[in-house]
Amino acid sequence: MKIAVLTSGILPVPAVFGGAVENLIDYYIEYNNQKKLHDITVYSIAPPKSSHIVDTTNTHYHYIDTTSFWGRLKRHIYVRSHSSTYYNPYIEYFLYESLKDIAKKDYDIIILENRPGYAIPVSKVSKARIIIHLHNDLLNKNSKDAKEICKVCDKVITVSNYIKSRVETIGAEIPIETVYNGIDLERFYQATPIDRKTLGFKEDDFIVVYSGRLIKEKGIEELIDAFIQLKDYPSIKLLILGGSFYGISQNNPFLDTLKKKCETIKNQIVFTGFIPYELLPNYLKVGDVAVVPSMWEEPFGLTCVEAMAAGLPLITTNTGGIPEICKNAVHVIDKKEINNLLYLQILSLYKDSPTLNKLGKIETFDKNVYAHSFLNSIK
């Protein structure tokens, strides 16, 4: 089949700048190239010229220039002369330019990656089947034009049953299928841990790993509060991957609060700052346990999968799609009771470390299983 993939219009594909959705696109493109299944054209903003990205027999890239002088000028003219209809004008410029090419092509399927708002404009220029690949809670009974979007689409593929249940609130007669995300498990299995001493830890420290941004929704404040309760256990340490207070110049009251709280336990916390994704497995494996204390409704919980793939026992919350992703493998606590339960759970694992390996054996999510399932679901 001839397939078009419309990306978010924010980050390029291939995922030279990272991005969870962009990485997942790369996985099924890579799998499709190996199996030679479909002719796929990816519509994306242009990556840096130094990336040396080339088409293959089965994959073609149609890039929208948003960074050169002429690209920025064209986008500026569009933004000044058009009002937004669904997304911000920069995303809608990307869609506008992509549709000019799509209208000339004869695709069988057009996949909308996490952009349900693309559906109606796409339906006006193409007779292809439209499939939404939904990574977040962006299509439910309260979403703009929800019923109209479902009418022009042929299917919705969701990353979890939680997201599926949110789409079902619309009450539309449209097929909805869950295909779980995947990661490169071999990269996590084969990774060698970073030397603890280079991070300032002792060999006998009990290291709790948090991977993610320093934002309220991710539960980082609740985790720091738990460590304040654990300050009488100096060998329990917190390793924060990817997050840092440094280099953030804008006024941020939430980060200011975190800074003040961290002062009381500064000898128990290490911030790594930015870490390239390819090194994440090496850093995760430094830990004894991972904590994903999400306080919002996680659509999937990719961070949980990464921790489990690294062989770490996991403490997380009962939010969104996390319980279905992590069943039988982790300690799931009620987010309403997190202030009472999180430090107790960390302390319990610290005192009962012989059980850690047993707790770390869990079901896994492989990128090739994901890619195979996803490409099967669009038939």
Predicted region positions:
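Glycosyltransferase donor-sugar binding loop
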Residues: 237-256
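A charged, aromatic-enriched C-terminal amphipathic alpha-helix characteristic of glycosyltransferases
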Residues: 89-93, 337, 351-379
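Acidic donor-binding loop of glycosyltransferase active sites
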Residues: 285-299
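Acidic anion/phosphate-binding donor-loop and adjacent secondary structure
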Residues: 142-145, 165-168, 183-198
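Short hydrophobic beta-strand element within catalytic cores of glycosyltransferases
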Residues: 313-316
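Conserved donor-binding/catalytic core segment of Leloir-type glycosyltransferases
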Residues: 157, 202-218, 224-227, 239
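Nucleotide-activated donor-binding/catalytic signature segment of Leloir-type glycosyltransferases, i.e.
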Residues: 124, 252-275
